[in-house]
Amino acid sequence: MTKNIGKITQIISAVVDVKFTNNGELPKILNALECYNDKQRIVLEVAQHIGDDTVRCIAMDSMEGLVRGVEVIDTGSPIRIPVGTETLGRIMNVVGEPIDGKGDIKSSNISSIYKPAPDFTHQSTECNILVTGIKVIDLLAPYTKGGKIGLFGGAGVGKTVLIMELINNVAKAHGGYTVFAGVGERTREGNDLYHEMIDSGVINLAEPEKSKVALVYGQMNEPPGARARVALSGLTIAESFRDMNEGQDVLFFVDNIFRFTQAGSEVSALLGRIPSAVGYQPTLATDMGELQERITSTKYGSITSVQAIYVPADDLTDPAPATSFAHLDATTVLSRQIAEFGIYPAVDPLDSNSQVLDPMIVGEEHYSVARQVQQVLQTYKSLQDIITILGMDELSEEDKLTVARARKIQRFLSQPFHVAEVFTGAAGKFVNLADTIAGFKGLVEGKYDDLPEAAFYMVGTIDEAIEKAQTLK
């Protein structure tokens, strides 16, 4: 079969026009094209057909040094990446090339990054709770196996640290594989995460096949084409793990889904599409839907997805985070106000929610305790204006008691993380669900009204709080 060869006619930023004149056959939309820039392979993806013989493409790599007239070959298929157990313990880029300096990924399975979502008949509707060991999440916004979870927060409130703790707690306790897609985030964080995984044994350098995680990175310095597609590359690997050996449970982490939207917006502008609200691409909902609908559980295996979602200027009504809301089963909202109090994880207990916080699923006791905790915190929030203006002395005895309990609950929602041990010096805690429910039940019932507030700060179980109270006396 003769190769379909074209030539570059125009380069504007990350957009490249390629003219095919030899046999009049244009590459299909989304096909991958290859060219070489000083022996370096560059992949282009067909985005538009303009005229009879020219295609407009988005580059997946840096364009530095590329010139007009360079030959381009149509590969005849979309971007294809290696999948399967050979990817474990390795870092690859959007087009499946290893970037960890450890040689080629020798996989016999190569898969396109574009696939249809599983049929309705193949999807699973079972509902099982995924225990994370993080009190505030397990009690107030529990995660489901095979669910989609969003971590919402502005800059610097702890999204990446929370994701790293979830990888530490869930991936270690969980039998299946994990895929981490780094979408447009800091290269330093990607490097830190990789070395942390090596130190904790999640990645085994001596025997990579014993590793539990595959990493796909398209960091901040990459062109928008790579950042817009790297989540799909990560998802393709996650799907291959889910469907292998008659089904596996897979964890799929994306940090950060906002950068996926942001890159799509850049690509859209470069292609000359008219922007919609706040300058986002007109296809925002479609792009998000195509990614999210593939993250699902089948009758054989599940993909549980945790997605960090940056909130521009802390505005949850911005179209990018707002479009994500519709697809999620649980939302964990990180609050700057709570972080300023020094309470970590800075999860907002009133804004965060989960579809599975239902007595039919979590049980009557769990549901009742969670709602009582939220009620106490909501009452405290509504009393805050009175406290600010008139002071605590003007409150009724009942309200004073509610405020005291709420402040203890707030502090008890904090917890030392394993991955933050190097910063805090405090040993990380994994708290079982039964201990979490028992602790908060005692707090709302007033069993610990005599203990000082400070005893509840940065501890695991209620027994640790009681021990800490003894040392504070």
Swiss-Prot record:
Topology of the protein relative to the lipid bilayer: Peripheral membrane protein
InterPro entries: AAA+_ATPase, ATP-synt_VA_C, ATP_synth_F1_bsu, ATPase_a/bsu_AS, ATPase_alpha/beta_chains, ATPase_F1/V1/A1_a/bsu_N, ATPase_F1/V1/A1_a/bsu_N_sf, ATPase_F1/V1/A1_a/bsu_nucl-bd
Primary location recorded for the protein, binned into one broad class: membrane
Keywords assigned by UniProt, alphabetized: ATP synthesis, ATP-binding, Cell inner membrane, Cell membrane, CF(1), Hydrogen ion transport, Ion transport, Membrane, Nucleotide-binding, Translocase, Transport
Gene Ontology molecular function: ATP binding; ATP hydrolysis activity; proton-transporting ATP synthase activity, rotational mechanism
Keyword Metal-binding set for record: no
Cellular component GO terms held in the UniProt record: plasma membrane; proton-transporting ATP synthase complex
Enzyme class: translocase
Binding site for ATP: G153, G154, A155, G156, V157, G158, K159, T160
Subcellular location(s) of the protein: Cell inner membrane
Catalytic activity: ATP + H2O + 4 H(+)(in) = ADP + phosphate + 5 H(+)(out)
Enzyme Commission no: 7.1.2.2
Protein family membership: Belongs to the ATPase alpha/beta chains family.
Complex formation: F-type ATPases have 2 components, CF(1) - the catalytic core - and CF(0) - the membrane proton channel. CF(1) has five subunits: alpha(3), beta(3), gamma(1), delta(1), epsilon(1). CF(0) has three main subunits: a(1), b(2) and c(9-12). The alpha and beta chains form an alternating ring which encloses part of the gamma chain. CF(1) is attached to CF(0) by a central stalk formed by the gamma and epsilon chains, while a peripheral stalk is formed by the delta and b chains.
Chain's role: Produces ATP from ADP in the presence of a proton gradient across the membrane. The catalytic sites are hosted primarily by the beta subunits.
Name of this chain's protein: ATP synthase subunit beta
Organism listed in the record: Rickettsia conorii (strain ATCC VR-613 / Malish 7)
Gene expressing this chain: atpD
